[in-house]
């Protein structure tokens, strides 16, 4: 009798899941997810590596996955512990012959997988590793992973010319996975047991993310088909306020309740049944960005996380805790930055447009180590994934392969361009709700009398700008260019 174990990682789904599909043909198919306590440690900056929003989403995802596996005849074993330690005890208890899991192209996760591989080798247990978190399967890449083009444009052109995404795999019809009496399925942890508090509800939160494959599929149906928003995705994707400005698939992608191929399959059908346009192309374009960061992460490994980034530009970053705290709290005096940072802290989400602006401000105006920002995003974002997060921060800080040198965002211009009426800023900054359109983007230009009239006195209800936008950029450009010259 052959017994197989599926080690679920950041792939919490039953559809388009090669390890699960292969394991389902065994006489008995078991499944486990390990909540690694290292992911909940406190960083040297004083906050937890995984904050309450992502942790709550994980709990919901595991609850949904357990329910789905039970409906198929199986069970999800949940353990808190390092995977290699958990499996050391679990493999003999279940008399496992083969372990099936997805590869994750990231340094820390790869080290964990190697430890599991060694454990299985020691016990004569077969391991089967598959790839499932990219749009294009590595077997179909027109280059070796070690030869992944350094620039996204080169990567994209080669992929578009030669590759097509595979269709998603079907879900197994039935599995035989009843646990032996001596093996307990284990409880899915609570936020409290993970050392976290339940985040308070805030009626300003317009984006509701419920974990699980079922909720992910409902979101695809709603966004693509029911609301027909894919048709205008390219035009609306930079919006920051409304739930359907962009797809909001990213939380489910990050923890693997959706695969990129599941999304691409819907896009293909949409193009056949409704329309093929720039927006449908752009949805696939964004998934290719995601692929790019994954293969670059695998190619360069730990280099992605060093201060000098992929390009080795060793900028003399500041370590100013007070400036960093003001950025975290959304009290910089720049409404676009502050609104986005308060949304992040209140909801665990921020638009892509917002992320670009706050990252630019932290690195190009405050001159603070980009890795501090990356770690804060890791802690707060419900859709955090390591390759995209650190890849994008490399880019924003000017230390990534695709970075354009010292390119900084004019925050006030961005505010006018993407929040022209100030709706988003006023939504998250109620102290500025009575400012008119001419004032909301630069409140520091109001006269003292006008500040008092609208209840937004600078230094009292709303802060003065903590730096001058252009003077600070000029100062940090000098520091950056010096480091760039030294790196050649």
UniProtKB/Swiss-Prot annotation:
InterPro entries tied to this protein: Cry_DASH, Crypto/Photolyase_FAD-like_sf, Crypto/Photolyase_N_sf, Cryptochr/Photolyase_FAD-bd, Cryptochrome/DNA_photolyase_1, DNA_photolyase_1_CS_C, DNA_photolyase_N, Rossmann-like_a/b/a_fold
Coiled coil: none
Alphabetic keyword roster: Chromophore, DNA-binding, FAD, Flavoprotein, Repressor, Transcription, Transcription regulation
A GO biological-process term: photoreactive repair
A Pfam family reported for this protein in Swiss-Prot or TrEMBL: FAD_binding_7
Molecular function terms, GO-annotated: DNA binding; DNA photolyase activity; FAD binding
Names of the cofactor(s): FAD; (6R)-5,10-methylene-5,6,7,8-tetrahydrofolate
Keyword hit for DNA-binding: yes
Cofactor note text: Binds 1 FAD per subunit. Binds 1 5,10-methenyltetrahydrofolate (MTHF) per subunit.
The Photolyase/cryptochrome alpha/beta domain, residue ranges: 2-135
TM segment ranges: none
Described function: May have a photoreceptor function. Binds DNA; probably functions as a transcriptional repressor.
Family membership noted in the UniProt record: Belongs to the DNA photolyase class-1 family.
Listed name of the protein: Cryptochrome DASH
Source organism (scientific name): Rhodopirellula baltica (strain DSM 10527 / NCIMB 13988 / SH1)
Lineage of source species: Bacteria, Pseudomonadati, Planctomycetota, Planctomycetia, Pirellulales
Underlying gene: cry
């Amino acid at each position: 009798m052959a017994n197989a174990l599926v080690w679920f990682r950041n792939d919490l789904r039953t559809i388009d899941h090669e390890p699960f599909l292969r394991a389902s043909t065994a006489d008995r198919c078991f499944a486990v997810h390990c909540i690694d306590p290292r992911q909940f440690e406190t960083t040297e900056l004083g906050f937890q590596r995984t904050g309450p929003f992502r942790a709550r989403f994980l709990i919901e995802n595991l609850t949904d996955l357990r329910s789905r596996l039970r409906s198929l005849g199986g069970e999800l074993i949940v353990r808190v512990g390092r995977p290699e330690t958990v499996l050391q005890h679990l493999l003999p208890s279940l008399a496992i012959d083969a372990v099936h899991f997805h590869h994750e192209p990231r340094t820390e996760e790869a080290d964990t997988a190697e430890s599991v591989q060694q454990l299985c080798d020691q016990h004569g247990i077969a391991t089967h590793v598959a790839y499932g978190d990219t749009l294009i399967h590595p077997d179909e890449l027109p280059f070796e992973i070690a030869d992944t083009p350094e620039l996204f444009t080169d990567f994209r052109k080669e992929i578009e010319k030669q590759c097509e995404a595979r269709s998603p795999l079907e879900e197994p019809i039935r599995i035989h996975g009843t646990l032996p009496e001596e093996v307990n399925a284990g409880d899915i942890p609570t936020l409290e047991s993970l050392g976290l508090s339940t985040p308070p509800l805030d009626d300003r939160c317009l984006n509701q993310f419920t974990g699980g494959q079922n909720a992910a599929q409902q979101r695809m149906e709603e966004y693509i088909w029911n609301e027909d928003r894919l048709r205008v995705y390219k035009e609306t994707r930079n919006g920051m306020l409304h739930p359907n400005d962009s797809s909001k698939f990213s939380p489910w992608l990050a923890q693997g309740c959706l695969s990129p191929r599941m999304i691409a399959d819907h896009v293909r059908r949409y193009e056949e049944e409704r329309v093929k346009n720039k927006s449908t192309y752009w949805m696939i374009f964004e998934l290719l960005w995601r692929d790019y960061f994954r293969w670059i992460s695998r190619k360069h490994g730990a280099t992605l996380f060093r201060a000098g980034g992929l390009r080795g530009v060793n900028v003399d970053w500041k370590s100013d805790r007070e400036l960093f705290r003001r950025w975290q709290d959304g009290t910089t005096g720049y409404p676009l930055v502050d609104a986005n940072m308060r949304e992040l802290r209140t909801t665990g989400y921020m638009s892509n447009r917002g992320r670009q602006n706050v990252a630019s401000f932290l690195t190009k105006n405050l001159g603070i180590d980009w890795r501090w920002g990356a770690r804060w995003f890791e802690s707060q974002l419900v859709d955090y994934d390591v390759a995209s997060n650190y890849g994008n921060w490399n880019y924003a800080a000017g230390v990534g392969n695709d970075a354009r040198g010292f390119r900084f965002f004019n925050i006030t211009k961005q505010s006018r361009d993407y929040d022209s009426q100030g709706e988003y800023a006023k939504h998250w900054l109620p102290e500025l709700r009575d400012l008119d359109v001419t004032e909301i983007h630069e409140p520091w230009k109001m006269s003292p009398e006008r500040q008092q009239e609208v209840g937004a006195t600078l230094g009292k209800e709303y802060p003065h700008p903590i730096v001058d936008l252009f003077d600070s950029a000029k100062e940090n450009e000098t520091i950056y260019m010096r480091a760039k010259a030294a790196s050649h």
